[in-house]
C-alpha cells in the first residue's frame, strides 16, 4: 500500500501543502461528504490551524476575520452543491475590502454534471467578478503533468489572493469516490518526487509580485505641492494594515503642519500624534468653521470616510487631492483625485516627510483650538447625565475600557459612526477592524470571532441588535471554537440608523416601524444561551466598562445594553448641538 491511501488523499495533501507553502496558516472547514479529502488534509497538514464551523455563511466570515487580522490568506472549505454559495457575501466583502481569501469548493466529477445527480450544481466561477482568480483543478490523476499542474495552479491562486488588489480566489476541486482514506491502489511509483512532494519549504512555482515602491518623481512633485500649501489635511479612511502607519502619519502631519482626520478603522486614530483630531465630524457640521477651514490640498489614505458631513466637506472644497493607494483600489467615487500614488503608504509617508519641516502653524492651531472647545463641550454634556448609557456613550466607554493593542471589531450602521463621532482618538494603539468594503451588517459576529482567533487573544465586538440577530448562528461557532470574544450589543429593538434618514420624516409611523424600524422584541439572553455566553446587562457607564474588562479576561460574553431608539435620535441632536454651539463664530486659533 502506498504512503497515501488513495489518489484523492494524495491530491488533497498536495493541494494543502501548496497552500501552506504559499503563506496560508488558517483553514475553516464546513462538514460535508464530497469535501472529505480536503477536510482530512486540512486537519493533517503541518503548519495549518484548522477550525470547524457548521454553517457556511458563518464560516466564510470567520475566515474573512482570520485573514483581516493576520493579513495572510485564510482558506475556507465547502462540500458540493449550494454549500459554497453561502460564502458569497464574505467573498464580496473580501473583494471590496481587499482581504486575501482562498475558497475551496469540492465538486462532483464531470460525469455527474448536468444529469440530475444529487447535490450537483454548476460551480464554475461561482463568485463571478468578485473572485480574483478561478481554476478547476480537474479530476485527480496519477500523472506527473496533472499533479505538477495542480500544484502550480494552487501556488498561482495564493499569489492572486495576496497580490494587490487583494481578494478572494476560488479553486473548484472535483472528486470521485472513495472520499474516505480507504486503500485503493494507484501507480504511485510512476510519479516523480516533484509531483508527489513539490519543492520542500517553498511553493512549486514561486511568483514574486513587484515591490510596492511609490514612484520617486511623483513623490517629489507631491512634496513640492505640500511645500507650497499651508492649508492641507491628511485624511485616513478604513485600512487594515498595522505596519507602522500611525507613526508614519504622525510624522508626516508634524512635518507638513496638516491636521489628521482619521477614522477608527484607519489604524492611525489610536496611537497617532498630536495633530490627530477626534471630533472632526462635529467641527465640520458647524458651517462657519467648515467654510473658514476649506483645505487647498488633501492627502488621502485608505478607503472613503464613513461620516457623511466630512466627506461632503472634502468633496465640496475644490481642493487638490492626492490619493495614496497601497492596496490597489481606487476609493474615489466623487473623482476628486488629481494624482493617485500606488505603492506602500508607509514608504510614501516616510519619503514625503524627508525634506519637510514646516511644523505646526496657524492653520493647524485653528483645528486644535476648535477641537478643544468641542471636547470640553462634549465632556460637559456627558457629565450632565453621568449614569445614562446612551448609544454615543456606549461607544465611548467601550474604547475607554480597552488596553493597548486590544482587538476591536465594529459593526456597520450606527456603531462605527458613534465610535468615530464620540470616542476620542488617543496615543494608546488599538487594532480596530470593520467590514467596510460592502458596508453590510451580515457576518459581523463571525468576522469578529475570526479576528479574535487570529489575534490569539480576547477581542471585543461593538454591534447593533439587528447585526447580531443577522448572524446569531455565530454563537454556535463561538461555542464550538472556544474563541474568546466579548460582544457588546446595543439593543434598540430595531434599525436605529433609519431614524436619522429622510424616510423617518415622510413615511407614516406604522409603515416606518414595519419596514424600517423593524422592532423584533427578541430577548437576547437566548443568543447568549445558544453559545454558552455569560450575559451582562449594564445600566451605567461604570458597569459597562467593568463588563468589557471582565470579558477581556477570557471566555464568551454578551454585554447587552438596552436603549430607546427615539431617545437615541434626541441624544445625538443634543450632543451635536452642544458641540456646534461651543465653536461660536470664531476666531478659533
Swiss-Prot record:
Pfam families found in the cross-reference section: TPP_enzyme_C, TPP_enzyme_M_2, TPP_enzyme_N
InterPro entries: DHS-like_NAD/FAD-binding_dom (IPR029035), MenaQ_synth_MenD (IPR004433), MenD_middle (IPR032264), THDP-binding (IPR029061), Thiamin_PyroP_enz_TPP-bd_dom (IPR012001), TPP_enzyme_TPP-bd (IPR011766)
Catalytic activity: isochorismate + 2-oxoglutarate + H(+) = 5-enolpyruvoyl-6-hydroxy-2-succinyl-cyclohex-3-ene-1-carboxylate + CO2
Keywords: Magnesium, Manganese, Menaquinone biosynthesis, Metal-binding, Thiamine pyrophosphate, Transferase
EC supergroup of this enzyme: transferase
EC number(s) given by UniProt: 2.2.1.9
SUPFAM superfamilies, alphabetized: DHS-like NAD/FAD-binding domain, Thiamin diphosphate-binding fold (THDP-binding)
Gene3D superfamilies recorded: 3.40.50.970, TPP-binding domain
Cofactor note (record): Binds 1 thiamine pyrophosphate per subunit.
Co-factor requirement: Mg(2+); Mn(2+); thiamine diphosphate
MF terms in GO: 2-succinyl-5-enolpyruvyl-6-hydroxy-3-cyclohexene-1-carboxylic-acid synthase activity; magnesium ion binding; manganese ion binding; thiamine pyrophosphate binding
GO biological process: menaquinone biosynthetic process
Pathway info: Quinol/quinone metabolism; 1,4-dihydroxy-2-naphthoate biosynthesis; 1,4-dihydroxy-2-naphthoate from chorismate: step 2/7; Quinol/quinone metabolism; menaquinone biosynthesis
Subunit details: Homodimer.
Xref: NCBIfam families: menD
Recorded family membership: Belongs to the TPP enzyme family. MenD subfamily.
Name recorded for this polypeptide: 2-succinyl-5-enolpyruvyl-6-hydroxy-3-cyclohexene-1-carboxylate synthase
Organism of derivation: Myxococcus xanthus (strain DK1622)
